[in-house]
Amino acid sequence: MSANVLLVSHGELAKSMCESLKMLVGDVGKFEYVCLDNDGVDKFRNSFRLKIDNIDNDKEVYVLCDIKGGTPFNEAFKYKLENKADFRILTGMNIPMLLDIYFNLDNLNSEQIILNSKESIEII
């Protein structure tokens, strides 16, 4: 079973991360994004709901957030609770996490993705 991925963030981070992933791997068709910008929370909420409602629910859905407890996370979590939606929310998104998900779309393991992302952080 393949998965769909929705990135959400403050500012243009989610968009930039999708663009960076595309630069590294090419087609990122199953990755989409919604950004919280200066237009406010209502616009973000509507954009998020539109995206999440139109994602193929026959596949796993992962929502990747920049910050746990931030507005994009809170809106995703609120939607999940209110709609009993079946998607996973992962926080602290980074490029290694996106690459791990991209290369394992057919066999995702949330716990392993988090572990791999943590292991990619080093002091050299």
Label the predicted regions.
Residues 2-64, 68-124:
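N-terminal loops that bind phosphate or other acidic moieties
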